[in-house]
Amino acid sequence: MQKNSILFVTLSAFTVFIWYFFFAQPSEQSYRQMMQLQNTVAVSESGVNKFKNADLNEFQIDDIYAKEEHINIETEQYKAVLTNKGGGVLSWSVKEKNGQWVDLVFPESAPVMANFPNLTYKVVSKSAEKIVFEYASKEGWKITKIYNLSDLYMHNLNISVEKNAKTPFPQIDLKWGPGLGTDSKELKENISLTRALVYTAVKPNKLKKLKDNFEPASLCKWTAVDNRYFLVAFIPKNSMDFDKILFSRLEKKHPCSVILKAAEPKDVDKKDYSVNFYLGPKDYKYLKTYDLGLEKTVDFGFFGFLGKIAFSILVFFYKLTHNYGWAIIMLTTIIQILVLPLTLKSFKSSAAMKRVQPVIKDIQTKYKDNPQRLKAEMLNIYQSQKVNPLGGCLPMLLQLPIFWAFFTMLRNAYELRNEGWILWVKDLSAADQFMQFGSFNLNLLPLMMGIGMFFQQRMTTVTSDPTQRKIMYIMPVIFTFMFWSFPSGLVLYWLTNSLISMIEQYFIMKKDAITVKHI
C-alpha cells in the first residue's frame, strides 16, 4: 500500500504545486505600476486603448479645470463616492462580515462608469436612493445619468441622451477597470485572479472568459469583471441597445478592463440606455437568487459538479454547527467514508502484490537474461494469483477528482471569508497566523499538517528502500512549505484528511496482520 499512498500523495502535491506557481504573484509595487500605466488610456474597438470621441474634445478641454463635486452615499452594506466629473464612480466599498470595508475601485482606475471623464456634469438631485447628473452642451445635445440605488448590491443606471437634428449622438460607454479592488492582504494575487467575463444569451448559456473584444453584445446577457471573492457585472435591460464589449489588457500580467459600448441610435433624437449593475461579493446562494447565471462566476474548478455537491453539504453542516471549521471537518470525514471502499480495494491489491513479491524476485533473478520468458512467467503469476499490478494505483487515482473538487471549492468559497474556527483561527480564507515575529508569521496549522503527514507515512512506509524512506521525510516538508500561506480552511481539510487516514490505516494494517497469520 505504501507505494500507492506515496504515488497518490505525490500526484496530489504535483497538482497543487503546479497550480500554485502557475499563478505567480507580482509585487504590490509592480501591480500598482501596471494599474497606473493601463489607466492612462482606455479601451478601443481594436483593443488599443483610446476613446473615439473626437467630436467632444473641445467640450472636454473647457471642462478640465471645472470644480469637482463628490457625492457620498453610505448604507449598512456599502458606501460609495460618486463624482460630477463624467458622472462616474470614484469609490465603491462593500462591508464584510467582520465590519471591514473593501473598495472595489482601485484609486489608480477611478473614475469608473464615467461618460467622458473630463466633462463636468451638473448634480440635479442626490439622495441615498437616487442621484441625477446632467450635462448640456452648447451644440444642443444633453446627457442625463440617473443612479437608482438599493440597500444591497444590485443597482440600476439609466443614461438618457438627447440631441437636435444637426448634432450626432455622442458615443455612450460603460467602463470598469483596469482591475478590481480587493483587500490589501490579497493585492498581490489579485492580478492573476482578475477576469473579464461574458455570459452568453444563446442557450445553453455559457460563461466565457474574455481574451478579446466580443460582438455583437446582443449575444450576451451580461459582462463582468471579477476576482476570487468579488464581482462587478453590467446587465443591460435591453441587450440590443449595445453594440460591442471591448476588452483590454496591455500585457498578460496586467489587469484587464471592459467597456460596454452602446449601439448608435437610428432615426431618433432621444435614446435611453438602462443597465442594472451588481457590485458585491460572490456569495453563491445569494447570486443564484437573481436567476441571471451570476453564480456561475464562482469557480468550482474542472470538476465543478463535484465541487457544487461538496459545497451544498458544507453549507448543510454549517447550518448544524454554525461554524465552517467544524463543517469542513465533518465534510472531510464524510468524503473519507465515501472513498473507504477505494482505499480498502487499494490495500487489498497492494497486500496481494506484497505476498507474491518473493516469487517475482526469484523469477526476475532466474530469467534476467530472457526478457520474453520473464514477462510470460510474471503474467502467469498475476493470473494464477488473481493479482493486478495496477489494482493498487487506480483506486487512488480515482480519488484525485474528489480531492481536487474539494480543494478548489474551499479555495474559492466566499462563505469562508472572515469565518473563524477555534482559538487563533479567525479567518478560514486566510493563513491562520498563530504568532508573528517581525514580518514572519508562524502559521500553526501547516506545521500540524506536516507532522501529521510524517506520522501517516511512517505508519505505511515499512521499507528498507532508501528512496522511499527519503520520500517519507521529504513529502511532509514540501507540503508544509506549499501550504504555509494557503487559507486555513484548506489546511484544516488536509490536516483532518491525514488524521482520518492514519486511523483507517491503523485498523486496516491490524486486520491485515491477523489475516496473514491464517494464510
UniProtKB/Swiss-Prot annotation:
The chain crosses the membrane at residues 6-26, 298-318, 324-344, 390-410, 434-454, 471-491. GO terms for biological process: protein insertion into membrane; protein transport. It is found in: Cell inner membrane. It is a multi-pass membrane protein. GO terms for molecular function: membrane insertase activity. Keywords: Cell inner membrane, Cell membrane, Chaperone, Membrane, Protein transport, Transmembrane, Transmembrane helix, Transport. The keyword Transmembrane applies. Its main location: membrane. The keyword Chaperone applies. Signal peptide: none annotated. InterPro entries: Membr_insert_YidC, Membr_insert_YidC_N, YidC/ALB3/OXA1/COX18, YidC/Oxa/ALB_C, YidC_ALB_C, YidC_periplasmic_sf. GO terms for cellular component: plasma membrane. It comes from the Bacteria. Belongs to the OXA1/ALB3/YidC family. Type 1 subfamily. Interacts with the Sec translocase complex via SecD. Specifically interacts with transmembrane segments of nascent integral membrane proteins during membrane integration. Required for the insertion and/or proper folding and/or complex formation of integral membrane proteins into the membrane. Involved in integration of membrane proteins that insert both dependently and independently of the Sec translocase complex, as well as at least some lipoproteins. Aids folding of multispanning membrane proteins. This is Membrane protein insertase YidC. It comes from Endomicrobium trichonymphae. The lineage of its organism: Bacteria, Pseudomonadati, Elusimicrobiota, Endomicrobiia, Endomicrobiales.
